[in-house]
Amino acid sequence: TGSSRPFDGEEGKRAAKLYESVFLGYGDDSIAQLGGAHIATEWVSNILTKVLQRGRLAAYLEQSTRYIAYDQEMPGGGYRYFRDENLGPRFSESMDEIFGIYSEALVKVEAWAADKYPRGDEPEGPWKRSIKAKALDLLRGLLPAATLSHVGIFASGQAYEQLLFRMMSSPLPEARQVGGMILEELGKVIPSFVSRVDRPDRGGEWITFLENRRSATEEWVARLGLDRREENPDGPTVDLLNVRGNEEDLLAGCLFESTGVSETAIRSRLEAMSSEERAELMGAMVGERANRRHRPGRGFESVSY
């Protein structure tokens, strides 16, 4: 029936009992990778989207400010920004002013883009959409962190458990509130996988650990005098602090999985190559990329900055 749940009936009960006996009784976290669920979080702040998408082992889809116009009212009225009475009237006034500036600028920037990039032979519909997207992309930097968005998530039970622990231990009230809502919904579809979250002896201890770790970090930040804001510098605001890996690391990483020799032997052979040969090898490892989705191999993970 339409109202039945995945774990209803005898088969569902047996499956739930199996998961719970292994997951709770033996503590084998990996079994929680065997089931997943979709969650849609609507009207969440830009700050919360960062909390939601911090976990590595999940799939996320966020409504992009690059394609959505924020000059329209949301259901119930008002611009699309997070509201809380504890933030006071000055907050709402400031948000309305920012979104008002955005709305006025959107019309002007769209007109500028239409003049800057004339239509030519392109059909009118696609051209108008591209002009709109250009204007939205140029103005998205005006949108504040309180801007609301939607985020879709697909994740395993294990990934959701970690997400809920982070949200429940967060100092952000919105994160704790939405975390409770996510837990309630997951309890309807994958209850065994999130059964530890609200148990004091399991999830409770984990959440307390995360809270204590954050408090300890904040204490050390204060002790080291790092809790004060820096003055805005006149020069560049981005510095290259360090680079991990070099050309040899990258090339060795690319070749390793296709060879039957040690990495030491690979590096020895690379050292004997000329600059021209290395450049040719690098080009071959990159390949003929037709678009941004054609990604080089994992050997490129050997270098980061």
What are these regions (language model features)?
Residues 1-305:
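A conserved ligand/cofactor-binding region detector
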